[in-house]
């Protein structure tokens, strides 16, 4: 009598495929039809982090992808859950973070005829505009190759978000186990090196050598590349001033003598040759137009050829992955050495010192209530002594001021709203950074920004993650002193509840909460929160009149020209 065949099903196959591709964590929200998939993943040793909202789970997966160069995995239920995660998927794609969102879905035969199935939605086609790629698996024997394609697409070339649709009938479909295991694909070399053209590298070095006022701009693509040593060696060898975009802070420490961050506007307006390294000439750099010299020449190191000439003509495009491009640039520099003119560095240093003095006066002024500057000065003091901290930052004024005030000392330690300027990334990024690194995380949040994902503090407490959340509470969106123009006694459109005690939320989840009104209280609470490694909220009471509308990008917010 022959032995009975062992059977398996779709959800077991996809979990085994994840394991064989070294995926060790899933972020998600369970429900129909993926609950048992999450249970089985956990049973097989994959860490499952359950969230209160799919958007935050997706943000955590994206943060993990940025930090590890491996796709972060987000698991959602069908239709509404899928749509909740879609913002995070789009955000990953826009920012160039590798992420795979896996969603269960309803019966294709019913959905395609629009016959009213449970949570009916054509999810794959809904995802396509917002993802680097979107795939649907219609038969269980394709689960292995589908995941392999998703992994490769998410990390190769410019990284991004990939959507993988798993209908319920495919997850439940049974197959003979040994045969099913042969369909699993282990992805080899998922992100092959893309070498730049040697002539482009030579031209780039030649142009930099002729420059009188060169500048290097480091973007988050440079941070993602993990080319920290090559970038440092190149910058220090040629003595070229550099300007880090916000998530590139720390590739070289912000206190480095060649950092031009404190003279940003002057450097951008006066540089004659600018080398963009994993940075795009988008709105964050005024598209290379307003505030820039008309005759600036650009060198652009980017993995995506379509990014070249997007806003300004690029004199020397160097297309390839950043690590390979920087290796080539270093080799060429050693053959054709040069040093940036001292006069340019000296002029930048004068402007840096002048601006630093102005900032010092703001930071050292004691006020009651606190404002952004003296409160962030206290935070800076503590983080200077805790340089391994991962810093998550979102808000308007809270983001803009923290970016300028708080120095970073190590690469990939700062996560923020990024290219899209998305509010709500805070708790998801904090959880993703903590789970991925095992290190303490400090999330500096505006009170409005915190509200987008605040319920994830339960997730933080449930997993006992070492996350300290510092909420700058001025009782409003931008500011808390809005005026009711209706005269009806209603809150202003920009007002939140004044005197809210966000620290009290921690009482519900057995975390730790502090309410602080002075810089000394803030220093003590933040130091204690970090050292304790306990989930902590610090409610920082600041002046409702502190801040400006839309932070540092007021010009992007149109004003009415008629009426009130």
Regions picked out by a protein language model, each given a short descriptive name:
Residues 165-170, 396-397, 543:
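A glycine-rich phosphate-binding loop feature that marks nucleotide/adenosyl-phosphate handling sites
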Residues 110-121, 265-268, 292, 309-311, ...:
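Thiamine diphosphate
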Residues 2-5, 141, 295-395, 519-528, ...:
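Phosphate/pyrophosphate-binding active-site segments
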Residues 163, 300, 392, 444-445:
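Generic enzyme active-site microenvironment
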Residues 11-15, 22, 29-32, 37-39, ...:
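Active-site diphosphate/adenylate-binding microenvironment
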Residues 130, 378-387, 506-512:
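A structural motif corresponding to the C-terminal end of an alpha-helix
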Residues 219-224, 364-365, 446-448:
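Conserved short loop/turn motifs at secondary-structure junctions
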Residues 2-339, 382, 466-469, 501, ...:
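N-terminal alpha/beta PP-like core and its mobile active-site loop of ThDP/TPP-dependent enzymes
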């Amino acid at each position: 009598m022959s032995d009975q065949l062992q059977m398996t099903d779709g959800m077991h196959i996809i979990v085994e495929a994840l394991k064989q591709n070294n995926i060790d964590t899933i972020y998600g929200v369970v429900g129909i039809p993926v609950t048992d998939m999450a249970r089985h993943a956990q049973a097989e040793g994959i860490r499952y982090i359950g969230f209160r909202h799919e958007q935050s789970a997706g943000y955590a997966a994206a943060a993990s992808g940025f930090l590890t160069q491996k796709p972060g995995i987000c698991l959602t239920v069908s239709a509404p859950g899928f749509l909740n995660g879609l913002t995070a998927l789009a955000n990953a794609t826009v920012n160039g973070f590798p992420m795979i969102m896996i969603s269960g879905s309803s019966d294709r035969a019913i959905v395609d005829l629009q016959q009213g199935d449970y949570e009916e939605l054509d999810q794959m086609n809904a995802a396509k505009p917002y993802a680097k790629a979107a795939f649907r698996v219609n038969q269980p024997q394709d689960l292995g190759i589908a995941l392999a394609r998703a992994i490769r697409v998410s990390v190769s070339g410019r990284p991004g978000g990939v959507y993988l649709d798993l209908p319920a009938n495919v997850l439940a479909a049974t197959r003979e186990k040994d045969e099913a295991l042969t369909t699993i694909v282990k992805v080899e070399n998922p992100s092959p090196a893309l070498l730049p053209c040697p002539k482009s590298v030579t031209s780039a070095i030649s142009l930099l050598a002729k420059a009188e006022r060169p500048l290097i701009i480091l973007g988050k693509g440079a941070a993602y590349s993990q080319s920290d040593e090559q970038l440092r060696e190149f910058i220090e060898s040629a003595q070229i001033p550099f300007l880090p975009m916000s998530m590139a802070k720390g590739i070289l420490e912000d206190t480095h003598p060649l950092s031009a961050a404190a003279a940003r506007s002057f450097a951008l307006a006066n540089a004659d040759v600018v080398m963009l390294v994993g940075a795009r000439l988008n709105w964050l750099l005024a598209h290379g137009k307003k505030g820039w010299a008309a005759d600036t020449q650009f060198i652009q190191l980017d993995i995506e050829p379509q990014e070249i000439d997007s806003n300004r003509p690029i004199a020397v495009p160097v297309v390839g992955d950043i690590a390979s491009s920087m290796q080539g640039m270093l080799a060429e520099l050693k053959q054709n050495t040069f040093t940036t003119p001292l006069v340019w560095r000296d002029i930048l240093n004068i402007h840096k010192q002048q601006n630093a003095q102005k900032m010092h006066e703001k930071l050292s002024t004691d006020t009651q209530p606190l404002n952004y500057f003296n409160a962030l000065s206290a935070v800076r003091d503590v983080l200077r002594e805790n340089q391994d901290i991962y810093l998550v930052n979102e808000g308007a004024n809270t983001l803009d001021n923290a970016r300028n005030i708080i120095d970073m000392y190590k690469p990939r330690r700062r996560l923020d709203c990024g290219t899209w300027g998305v509010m709500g990334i805070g708790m998801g990024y904090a959880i993703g950074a903590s789970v991925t690194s095992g290190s303490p995380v400090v999330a500096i949040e505006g009170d409005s920004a915190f509200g987008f994902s605040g319920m994830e503090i339960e997730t933080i407490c449930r997993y006992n993650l070492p996350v300290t959340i510092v909420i700058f509470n001025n009782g409003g969106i931008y500011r808390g002193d809005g005026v009711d123009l209706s005269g009806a006694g209603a809150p202003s459109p920009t007002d939140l509840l004044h005197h809210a005690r966000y620290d009290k939320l921690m009482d519900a989840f057995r975390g730790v909460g502090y309410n602080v009104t002075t810089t000394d209280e803030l220093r003590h609470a933040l130091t204690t929160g970090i050292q304790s490694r306990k989930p902590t909220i610090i409610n920082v009471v600041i002046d409702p009149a502190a801040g400006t509308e839309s932070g540092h990008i007021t010009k992007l917010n149109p004003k009415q020209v008629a009426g009130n």
